A protein has these predicted regions:
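Active-site His/Glu-centered metal-binding helix of metallohydrolases
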Residues: 95-104
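Active-site scaffold of zinc-dependent metalloenzymes
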Residues: 66-90
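Short, well-structured alpha-helical interface segments that form or flank functional binding sites
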Residues: 90, 103, 107
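Bacterial Sec-dependent N-terminal signal peptides
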Residues: 1-23
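Metalloprotease/metallohydrolase-associated module, dominated by Zn2+-dependent proteases
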Residues: 20-68, 78, 120-180
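Membrane-interfacial alpha-helical segments at the cytosolic side of multi-pass membrane proteins
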Residues: 107-116
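Residue-level marker of positions within ordered structural domains that often coincide
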Residues: 7, 81, 145
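Short alpha-helical functional segments enriched in proximate histidine and acidic residues
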Residues: 102, 115, 143
Length: 180
């Protein structure tokens, strides 16, 4: 039986659940199995589930019915109470695989921030921001799926190593847009 690992991308907006425990992405703090606090899904073929996503919010400043400015928040979050694993089936390699799902989420948060930085206030800014958000999430979902397919959910260790190197390089390219 092929063991599968499951990744869930949670697309949350700021304010959905202020009591939800979240961990912001950090260069220095990597995930540990202790961060996966949900009860495992006994019916799942997966041995681990990482719940992470991009949290996005914005405000628009107007004057005399004209848009004169806007501000945004874009965060890469991990949700411990929605993430789980089967202790007896997991390894350091699987944890690396799960960490990279979170790193990929951070990469797309950086891409989102970069694209936002190129926008200027205008009457269509809300539509532009929402369109960018949808586009980034679509790209993120495709990349997460490709990552799982190419690594065979971490079973292909050579592919796992390739992806780790690739994502590290991509994160470096967008260093100025990293989560703070």
């Amino acid at each position: 039986m092929q063991i599968k690992y499951l990744f869930i991308l949670m697309l949350l907006f700021i304010g959905n659940n202020p009591d939800e425990e979240v961990m912001s992405w950090s260069e220095t703090k990597k995930l540990t199995w202790k961060d996966f606090k949900a009860e495992p899904n006994q019916k799942s073929d997966a041995v681990a589930l990482t719940a992470s996503g991009i949290t996005f919010g914005f405000s628009i400043k107007t004057s005399d019915k004209r848009v004169v400015g806007f501000s945004t928040t874009v965060e890469s979050h991990f949700y411990p109470n929605k993430s789980w694993y089967f202790k007896e089936k997991c390894s350091d390699l699987i944890l690396r695989h799960e960490q990279l799902h979170f790193d990929i989420t951070e990469l797309y948060a950086r891409k989102f921030r970069e694209k936002i930085s190129k926008l200027q206030a205008n009457r269509n800014i809300k539509k532009q921001l929402n369109g960018l958000h949808a586009s980034i999430n679509n790209e993120l979902n495709k990349t997460q799926k490709r990552y799982d397919e190419e690594t065979d959910h971490s079973i292909n260790e050579a592919a796992q190593n390739h992806w780790e190197n690739f994502i590290a390089k991509e994160l470096m390219k967008l260093e100025q847009f990293k989560s703070k």
